Amino acid sequence: MAVAIPISLRFFLYYTMNRFAKRFIFHYLAKSLNRKERNVMKKLIALTLSLCLLLALAACAPNQNTTGGDANDYLSKIPAIEDLTETDTSKIIGLEDGILTVGMECAYAPYNWTQMDDSNGAVPISNVPGAYANGYDVMIAKRICEAYGWELEIVSSAWDSLTPAVQAQTMDANIAGQSMTADRMAEVDMAGPYYYATIVCVTTKDSKYANAKSIADLAGGKCTSQSGTIWYDSCLSQIEGAELLAPAETAPNMIMQLQTGSVDFICTDMPTAMGAVALDDNLVILNFSGTDGDFQFASEAERAENVNLGISVLKGNEDLKNAIDKVLSAMTEEHFNILMDQAIAIQPEI
């Protein structure tokens, strides 16, 4: 009988192996190799790690069940995609070839994840042979490309490499659950919002924090979040006496730290929390939004800036930003929520 391994653990094992390869194998073995031999070794290790990722995900079948009715019922609840194929987009930076190259982690359910087939409309990951990406971000990317008749290419990237990739023009856009912060928008332009998020915490049902009604009730707790996020950089520090651990490299790693008892609670956004709870009924969401006990920002405008999610494009690429915004403008917050509910319904099972 096969043993089900949580997807968070599978990705943790992959990233651990990746770090080991870079820091141990290269350090101790590469010294005796010349440059050509080192390049060959790097390619072999990269291939091996990709195969390890595929094997780690092999047992992770996408959930083919939905919240009820036909699998495509949700499409009747959102606007049809406007036909914009007559629009000349050949002069848009990066779109000269008609291909929109989109970066995402492919490890951040329900926004994006990796699966082993094209079920539920998944799209091949160009730099991970045999693997496919799906999730809310993929759904949004497909709507944009369908509107203009563009071909969609999805590239898997580490979180911290997403913005530099857009700046270097190796990606045309990032659709990856990125907040529209002032710091990020100083580096790239952002279309959107393409999702209106809420900041929440997640803990276990048997935790002493399970009945927390405000961030004050989380005082003294051990916690973490994902690196490079507003949740880690600005929210957790508002909890009095909190023991803040090093940030997790990925969302699955963050969730696994909670599941294994390394932390008392994590801070994330509502979709990530909902996705985690859907796969692990021992987790519970702590939502303080709309109360005096919520995380604080200088103004509601600043809250929106730090919570709402946008699509990164090259600084100054107004044509691409405007093209994406035209597609997004046809949808409301309710429509985005319907799409997100569908993504949660089909995300990989444990």
Question: Can you describe what each PLM-predicted range is?
Answer:
Residues A56-A59:
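C-terminal motif of bacterial Sec signal peptides marking the signal peptidase cleavage site
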Residues A61-L84, I140-A147, D206-Y209, G220-K222, ...:
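Extended ligand-binding regions for polar small-molecule ligands
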Residues K142, E146, E151-D217, T291, ...:
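Acidic, polar ligand-binding/catalytic clefts
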Residues W150-E151, Q167-A176, G221-C223, Q259-T272, ...:
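Alpha-to-beta junction loops
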Residues P6-V40:
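Short, Lys/Arg-enriched N-terminal segments with co-localized hydrophobic residues
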Residues C106-A109, G130-E146, Q178-S179, T198-I255, ...:
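Bilobed "Venus flytrap"/periplasmic-binding protein-like clamshell domains
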